Amino acid sequence: VFVNKKLIFRYSKNNPIYCYKLPNNKVKVYRPKAQKSNYKWLSNATNNELQGFSQLTQETEMLVITKSMKDVMCLRSFDIEAIAPQAETNHINYETLQLLNQQYRKIVILYDNDGAGIKGAQELYKTLPNAKIIYIPKQTKCKDISEYVSMYGVENGKKLLTKLI
């Protein structure tokens, strides 16, 4: 992977690299084994670009706002409309939130159950007071839905979401 024409890291068995292609010729690179301070995530997307937004079908009454593309993909596999900002600390602009609020009868906020996720969900709720905030229960030892599905399976993931929503 290059940043400003300089090679900053290479793929290896011990350093896997995943690249998500986003709309408008944007990409997001993820290195799951990297330390947070050492380019764990790289992207040329702006804070205003929502992951999963271009895949919304607008054929359901519910939208889940989650924290990552991985969670969006997991929710979409359950036929649940989902989007995510570039990070939990990024704010979705007010106009977009109002548009989504008009389009969907029910909006659910499903961020990580850690400090950053809880804070991010509470901030988002200030702009979407009719939304429902849910978290993956901490006793599951999972911070998000994709981790839960990985640990407990697809069917249990669906059951948990049905119960929480």
Over which residues does each language-model region extend?
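TOPRIM fold recognition
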Residues: 60-63, 69-165
